[in-house]
Design a protein with these regions (language model features):
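AMP-forming adenylation/ATP pyrophosphatase catalytic core
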Residues: 1, 12, 94-101, 108-339
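ATP-dependent adenylation/nucleotidyltransferase module used to activate substrates
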Residues: 1-126, 137, 145-147, 228, ...
Length: 339
């Protein structure tokens, strides 16, 4: 392949997370020079604010727990960047994600897990459909992270020992999420109540609270551990309970993106799947009810901790080798108590 290096300029502010800073652009340019290839910089900062930063802020206002890195992949890397690449006449976009693209016996392209289990990123690129998979390459997906670094050392690349990027690029390690959101929205105080409605505590920022949270709730010390089991955003009320109240039997997931249209009908017949709800979480067994082509209900084989509304939920085949679909958790269909 004839290769051209590309860096997307996304976040205009400072970044100390190892991604999207001015120094990262400079690193990419210098690596391209070492490799003897051209290097382009595309300024997608307006798109990044529109599709990633602004929705991230609004999600917190709405009481959701968003995943901005997934939205960046959805709207920037595999939409705007691919669109620009096609306009410039390129045959494919290659990224450094630890995932693989394989073809099954029926000729369907499959987004498979990366060879390095600890670094697998199929969860964060789950939104790729057949057209996007056809235009995408993951050249390091068959390698471990250690092998990638070894190869970079062999080539003498200046970034060979550069630390992995961490966390959300526009949230600084020093200021954190509280400072970022506090500069953009007014925080709302909220009551913290027990399940019987009695007062338990209070918080100064409802927007910073998520399902399963245990600290920062203004609760008296010395008692049993209490967790956030419900966030009532319109009424500015947070309900806490013991850990058993966090478990549910099922969850509704909407905004579903199918890897292949054939998977919709297959899951109506054979509905066993494995489900992952965080970037490095364990895939857990469930069955699927296809409610519409864009909404499903997942029924856990064993009750599981609730998935915070707004989080991405990804379905894998029963051997846990490739992605079937993914969407956004919107509600618990049936809560259970383990007590």
């Amino acid at each position: 392949h004839e290769v051209v290096g590309v860096t997307m300029r996304l976040w205009g502010g400072e970044s100390d997370t190892g991604c999207c800073s001015v120094s990262d652009v400079d690193d990419a340019r210098r690596v391209a020079q070492q490799l003897g290839i051209d290097h382009l910089v595309f300024n997608f900062s307006d798109d990044f604010n529109k599709h990633v930063v602004d929705p991230y802020v609004q999600a917190h206002v709405d009481g959701l727990t968003p995943n901005p890195c997934i939205e960046c992949n959805r709207h920037l890397k595999f939409d705007r960047l691919s669109e620009r690449a096609r306009l410039l006449g390129f045959d494919a976009v290659a990224t450094g994600h630890h995932a693989r693209i394989e073809k099954d016996d029926e000729g369907t392209l499959r987004l498979a897990r990366g060879a390095d289990d600890a670094k697998d990123q199929s969860y964060v690129v789950h939104m790729l459909d057949q057209n996007e998979l056809e235009f995408t390459m993951f050249p390091v997906g068959h390698l471990t992270k250690a092998q990638v670094r070894d190869r970079a050392v062999e080539l003498g690349l200046r970034t060979a020992t550069k630390p992995d990027s961490q966390d959300v690029c526009f949230i600084s390690k020093t200021g954190g999420r509280e400072t970022f959101l506090g500069n953009r929205i007014p925080f709302r105080p909220a009551r913290v109540v027990n399940e019987d409605g009695s007062e338990a505590g209070s918080v100064e920022a409802l927007e910073l609270v998520t399902i399963g949270q245990r600290k920062g709730l203004g609760l008296p010390g010395g008692g049993p551990k209490q967790y956030v089991v419900d966030v009532d955003t319109p009424n500015a009320r947070i309900t806490v309970g013991d850990e058993s109240k966090l478990f549910c039997q099922s969850v509704v997931v909407n905004d579903i993106v199918w890897s292949s249209e054939t998977d919709v009908e297959r899951l109506r017949v054979n509905n066993d799947v494995l489900v992952q709800s965080s970037a490095h979480g364990v895939a857990l067994p469930a069955t699927v009810e296809v409610l519409t082509e864009s909404e499903i209900r997942l029924n856990w084989l064993v009750p599981q901790r609730r998935i915070a509304p707004g989080q991405s939920v990804v379905l894998y085949n029963v051997t846990n080798s490739y992605v079937l679909a993914g969407g956004i958790a919107c509600s618990d269909s049936e809560k259970v108590s383990l007590s």
